[in-house]
A protein has these predicted regions:
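Extended alpha-helical scaffold segments
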Residues: 1-163
Length: 163
């Protein structure tokens, strides 16, 4: 209540309150990143708030948490490549964090994605061709989000990847 009052009247927060607020925001973001499943709406709101803090909240320790979470998500995806929900969740997280100035080092995530891309053509389409196409579209969108050039995601046999 005191912080809201001070902000509403345009007064700056005392340094002790500002530091406390940044710490709580940092921990809230960390908890959202570590939660299963991730509440993306809450995480997005927290990240937007953190972006107004001049980079003091989105620091190296949160970068480490993001990297670890994304690495776990790609490992889960390697184990369950046909589950579109896992692809979409990783893509949604990547969309939120990739533009942030956090110095993310996602080489393991990108390598896992590349490995999955090589396996995607061998996945059986099952009985639902539309679901297989949706999975492929989601997977290619994830690749684009992770920084792969669209042409590098094409296979020599596009029928197999879209099957």
């Amino acid at each position: 209540p005191l912080m809201n009052f001070l902000q509403n009247i345009g007064a700056p927060l005392p340094p002790a309150l500002e530091t406390t607020r940044e710490y709580v925001l940092h921990e809230d973001i960390r908890r959202r990143l570590e939660a299963y499943p991730i509440d993306f709406d809450q995480l997005k709101a927290l990240i937007q708030d953190a972006q107004t803090r001049n980079g003091r909240v989105l620091d190296a320790s949160l970068s480490f948490v993001v990297k670890n979470r994304m690495e776990h998500m790609i490992q889960d995806l390697v184990a369950n490549p046909a589950e579109i929900e896992r692809i979409q969740a990783l893509d949604r997280l990547a969309h939120l964090v990739m533009p942030l100035p956090m110095g993310l080092n996602l080489w393991k995530v990108q390598n896992g994605y590349w490995e999955l891309l090589q396996q995607l053509a061998s996945l059986p389409p099952g009985n639902d061709a539309e679901a297989a196409r949706a999975r492929t579209r989601a997977f290619l969108e994830l690749g684009s989000t992770l920084g792969f050039a669209p042409n590098s995601l094409r296979t020599s046999d596009p029928v197999k990847i879209a099957a």
